[in-house]
Structures are given as C-alpha cells and as structure tokens.
Amino acid sequence: MIANLVSMETDLAMNIGLDTSGEAPTALPPMPNVTETLWDLAMVVSQSTQWPLLDTGSSENFSELVTTETPYVPYGRRPETYIVPILFALIFVVGVLGNGTLIVVFLSVRQMRNVPNTYILSLALADLLVIITTVPLASTVYTVEYWPYGSFLCSLSEFMKDVSIGVSVFTLTALSGDRYFAIVDPLRKFHAHGGGRRATRMTLATAVSIWLLAILCGLPALIGSNLKHLGINEKSIVICYPYPEEWGINYAKSMVLLHFLVYYAIPLVVIAVFYVLIALHLMYSASVPGEIQGAVRQVRARRKVAVTVLAFVVIFGICFLPYHVFFLWFYFWPTAQDDYNAFWHVLRIVAYCMSFANSCANPVALYFVSGAFRKHFNRYLFCRGASGRRKKRGQHDTFCMHRDTSLTSTASKRFQSRHSCYQSTIRSCRLQETTITTLPNGGNQNGANISAVELALPVLQAPGHNEAHAPPSYGFLPLNEIVQQTRSSPAKFQESLLN
C-alpha cells in the first residue's frame, strides 16, 4: 500500500509540474501533502458500523478533507480487503463451535449447574449472540465501499456489539467479586458454596441484572445509528454511523469517553481491587500454621478458579486495549486527523479484529485450563462423528451417553448385582433383612409405613467387628441412609467449568 501511495504521489506531482509541451514552468504551485491526504481518505472511506472515524458534525473539516480531485487507494488494492474477511471467518467458526458447545454442556450436564458456571454461560450467550448477528456484517467493512445491509441491520449491529461488550465486562466483574467472597469470606452465600438455593437465586438475579444494564447501555446505539452518505471522487460512499449529527457536535467525543470508562476503565479497576484483596488474604493465610488438610485443598481449588477468571480478565483487557487507545487518540488528540499515518491505520485494523476475537477467546482458554470442559467438549465432538455407526450396530455409545452420577442409582445397581450373585450361590454376596420396629400407630420409628423389608448393601467394616448375618469383613448400610448422606453433601458431585 505504501508503494501505491508513493506512485500516486509521483504521478500527481508530474501532472501538476509539467505543461502540455513537457517543459517545466518557471513557477510551480505549492505541492500539497498528498500522502497524508490519501491516508485520510482511506480512513474516511473505510468507516464501518463499529469504527466511525470522522466527526462529521463539523462540515468544514469534512469539506477540507474530502475533495473531488484527490485520488484514493481502491479497496481492491488494499491488503486488508483480503486479510480481514479470512480472520473474521476463523472468528465465526471458532466462536460458534466453542460457545455453542459450552452452552450445550451447561444445559445437558446437571453437575455443571453452579454459580461460576452460570456466569460462564452468560458470557458464552453474549459472545455467541454477537458472533451470529454482527461478525458476518462487520466482515464486509473492508471488502466493499458501502454498507449493503440497510438501516435496520446497521442499528442492530451497533446495538448487539455494545450489549455483548457490556455483558462480558460486567460478568467478569461479578465473577471476580464471587471469587473474592469464596476465598476471603466463604461462609457468606454470595458465591458458589455447596450449590445452595439462595446462592443460585442470587446468581440468576445478578446475571439478569447484568443483561438489563448492558441493554440499557446499548440503547443509544440502537436509536442513533443510521446510514450516512459521503461523496468522494463522484462516488457515493454509504457507511453505518452510530453518532447522529443532530445529537450535537460533541456527542461522538462524549460517547467514546463514556465507553472507555463504563466498558473498560472502571470495571478493570474494580476487578484489580478484588484481586489485590484476594492476594493479600492468601499471603496472610499462608503464614498461619495448623490448617486442616481438607480446608487447604478447598482453598487451592478456589484459588485455581480465581486464576482462571483472572485469565479471562487479562484476555479481555488485551483484546480491547488497542480499541480504546485508537479512539481516544483520534477524538481527543488535537492534530489526530493530520497525524493519521500507516502506523495508526494498521493499529486501527488490528484493534478492529481483536475486539471481535475476544468473543471466541474464552472457550479456547477454557479448553486448555479446564479439564472438565475439555472432557465434555471432546465427548460431544466425538459424538457427532461416531454415534451413527455405533447405533447401527446396537452398541452403547460411551461418548454420547451421559452417565448418571447419582449415588442412589449406583447403590441400586450394586444391590441388584449382589442379589443376582446371591441367586447364583456366590457366598460373598448376601441379602439381609433388617428388623423393623413397629410403633402402635402402624409406622416405624421415623413415622413412615414400611410394608416390605428394608434393603441393605454390604460395606467394609473395621477389623474385629462381629455381625450376626454377615461375614466378619462386611457390614450393611441401609439404602435410604446412603441417599440421605448423598443429599446432605451434594458439593462432592458438582463439577465446575473453571476446574
């Protein structure tokens, strides 16, 4: 592109400096800075739904910048015309596959339904929504010189972009707060502690509030975005512009600053405060001796989740840093339009792609850091390729079928197996009838009517224990007692996508 600009500048200089006879005149008109003008024109023509670069509220600046005699680099001669669509195709495929699988895992696997995973589900929904509604439209910004989708999709694209950014950054802030309470003050029910109903209700309320707040922040883009026609070299360039002129000349600057504060600076400061407090607490806890081994393991697990959330925050900060740097420079630097050069042009394109790449980065990061998500992702991925052949042979598809981890069903299967062994005269398996104490009201000691024998399962006993109806090495535990113990400690059977 730089070579094309130099060639154009040379041709224009030759046309200005020579007359029809080929001799140089005695006095030449002043030579304009053609290179800077061409960069400015490339900036204006490639305005997009996500990247309005010119404050068109000032008609004087626009008339000085866009002239009918100055050439510009056509889209077909720009490298970003071919590079950006390829990158957006990769973002679309990875984002749909990763976020879609993440949503399916959460909805299909009951053990995944806890507080941290609920926030991760909210992130995946926002990312999948912006990938489906905005990425296909935004991929053509560097391909064609006009917005071909109409005014409605212009407003919808801008709105969904702001909603997705808002849900992402607000959810990361909520996750950081949840990790703070889980590590520093684990007795409070503001985090995923045992999957309690109160924690679940509060998590759902927080997630819904985040979506409502993000929708509220995106309403200005939905209402104000419209199509704008620009005339360049007798061409009509149509762009999707989110800052209407009738809303004031400083409206664009105000929105750029507001987006930086609400969508980036303030949430990252809050997250940083949470993690500084977590680090101080962990440093203090490490100096206190005599902790129980189980508590140490629990703290380590929560610390791992906190590190994973911090990785999501770092990815978000890196992806949107060029975005805010470019916009703050362009709208608040006094000579930004005059200083726009190759460096800022490349930075603008990189920031444009990185802002959308954030929507597919979370599932990729989660796949590498979370063994639970990696296991379920591989299971569903293999299911699509192998289920057909296995079903035709009548075989059980171990990749597709979800194994029920409930201890109740496991205990029932163990009893059926031992009862079958008893029928086959295997001595190590027995069926015991327990004595039921009947009360005068016709019930047992728990107040429940029992008309059949209570089934019991063999469990290992301590050495030297004597049991009348069982081998010395075995005892029997009632099935209903096992179920009661399972319900009293459900946290052991829950998984987290962040583990």
Curated annotation (Swiss-Prot):
Q: Which GO terms describe its molecular function?
A: allatostatin receptor activity; neuropeptide receptor activity
Q: What function is annotated for this protein?
A: Receptor for the neuropeptide CCHamide-1. Plays a role in the modulation of starvation-induced olfactory behavior where starved flies show increased responsiveness to food odorants, repellants and pheromones. Contributes to regulation of sleep latency (the time required to fall asleep), amount of sleep and depth of sleep (arousability). Involved in modulation of PDP1 and PDF levels in s-LNv (small ventral lateral neurons) clock neurons in response to CCHa1 released by DN1a (anterior dorsal neurons 1) clock neurons, to regulate morning activity.
Organism (species): Drosophila melanogaster
Question: Can you say what this protein is called?
Answer: Neuropeptide CCHamide-1 receptor
Query: Which residues are exposed on the Cytoplasmic face of the membrane?
Result: 107-117, 184-203, 281-309, 370-499
Q: Which family does it belong to?
A: Belongs to the G-protein coupled receptor 1 family.
Name the membrane topology term. Answer: Multi-pass membrane protein
Q: What is its main location?
A: membrane
Q: In which tissues is it expressed?
A: Low levels in larval brain and gut with higher levels in adult brain and gut. In the brain expression is widely distributed, including strong expression in the mushroom bodies. Expressed weakly in s-LNv (small ventral lateral neurons) and strongly in l-LNv (large ventral lateral neurons), but not in other clock neurons.
According to its UniProt entry, the protein's GO biological process terms are: G protein-coupled receptor signaling pathway; neuropeptide signaling pathway
Q: What InterPro entries does its record include? A: Bombsn_rcpt-like, GPCR_Rhodpsn, GPCR_Rhodpsn_7TM
Keywords (A to Z) from UniProt: Cell membrane, Disulfide bond, G-protein coupled receptor, Glycoprotein, Membrane, Receptor, Transducer, Transmembrane, Transmembrane helix
- Listed transmembrane segments: 86-106, 118-138, 163-183, 204-224, 260-280, 310-330, 349-369
